């Protein structure tokens, strides 16, 4: 009898431990860098390619937390509010590259051809917002992905091409004469040092306040350790396929602008970003500014 009770107790304890492990979904690229320092015994992380798995997860509630483009999370929240925005984790990770110029600056863009990924998406909108402010006229050719944009650049580095990390660092390794313009830096100069909140942490409504707070604290520490370029985390990033070389990953981290800021603390930045999107493509975020229920708060 005692033996049966002991077995039952062990099974119950194991079941409790299993439920404590949170499932996180994250897209490949800079967002995947943020999770490299998380304890894998506490967090089960699924790294995916493309937006389709993210859209499916937001609709089904399959994961405890999702790291996703901010605009995608907002748009899907408008139709099904299973997840709240808890924090911003990736800030502005768009870059223009070219090897044609001695010193590549925003002034070099006027009357040029630019290859841009993601027509009518955030990448396109941020670039157009910056160009409009500087009254710069360009001709844009669109491609459907960063990978395709990068391939075109390798084929002809004299072109001006929009990319994102970690592709930027990979291109610099392949084409050492590459110069780049960090659009985040330009954006900040237009908006009183505000950054644009590119990717965010979204948490399922079923999570407890303690679970969310612990996740935020652990993710913040993970990002801190990633920014410190700890060698074991670089190795883990290579094993996840973010890039295939630790030195390239190290370079990519510094240009990815990784930092965790609670969503409510970043509301001014989010409002500015959302207003820009509403002005150029309202459908990208569901057509309206979110109410306060979109933001997770430990005081709610």
Q: Which residue stretches match the model-derived regions?
A:
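Conserved C-terminal helix/tail region of periplasmic/extracytoplasmic solute-binding proteins
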Residues: 271-300
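Secondary-structure end/capping motifs
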Residues: 206-280
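Bacterial signal peptide processing site
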Residues: 17-19
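Periplasmic-binding protein-like
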Residues: 88-98, 177-205, 252-256, 292-299
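C-terminal motif of bacterial Sec signal peptides marking the signal peptidase cleavage site
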Residues: 13-15
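Pocket-lining segment of extracytoplasmic ligand-binding domains
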Residues: 145-236
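Sec-dependent signal peptide recognition
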Residues: 2-7
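Short, glycine-/small- and polar/acidic-enriched structural segments
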Residues: 21-128, 132-134, 141, 159, ...
């Amino acid at each position: 009898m005692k033996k049966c009770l002991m077995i039952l107790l062990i099974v119950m304890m194991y079941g409790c431990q299993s439920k404590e492990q949170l499932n996180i979904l994250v897209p490949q690229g800079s967002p995947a860098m943020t999770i490299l320092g998380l304890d894998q015994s506490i967090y089960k992380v699924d790294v995916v390619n493309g937006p389709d798995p993210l859209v499916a997860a937001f609709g089904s509630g399959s994961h405890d937390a999702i790291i996703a483009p901010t605009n995608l999370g907002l748009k899907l929240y408008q139709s099904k509010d299973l997840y709240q925005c808890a924090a911003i984790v990736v800030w502005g990770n768009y870059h223009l590259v070219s090897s044609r110029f001695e010193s590549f600056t925003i002034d070099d863009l006027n009357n040029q051809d630019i290859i841009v990924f993601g027509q009518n998406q955030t990448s396109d909108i941020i670039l157009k917002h910056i160009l409009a402010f500087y009254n710069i006229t360009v001709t844009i050719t669109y491609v459907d992905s960063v990978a395709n944009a990068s391939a075109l650049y390798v084929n002809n580095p004299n072109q001006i091409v929009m990319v994102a990390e970690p592709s930027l660092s990979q291109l610099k390794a392949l084409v050492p004469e590459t110069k780049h313009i960090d659009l985040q830096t330009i954006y900040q100069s237009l908006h009183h040092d505000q950054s644009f909140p590119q990717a965010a942490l979204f948490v399922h409504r079923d999570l407890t306040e303690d679970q969310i707070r612990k996740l935020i604290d652990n993710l913040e520490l993970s990002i801190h350790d990633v920014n410190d370029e700890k060698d074991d985390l670089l190795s883990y990033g290579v094993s996840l396929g973010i890039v295939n070389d630790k030195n390239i990953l190290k370079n990519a981290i510094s240009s990815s602008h990784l930092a965790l800021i609670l969503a409510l603390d970043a509301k001014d930045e989010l409002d500015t970003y959302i207003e820009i999107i509403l002005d150029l493509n309202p459908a990208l975020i569901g057509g309206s500014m979110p109410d306060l229920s979109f933001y997770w708060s430990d005081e709610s």
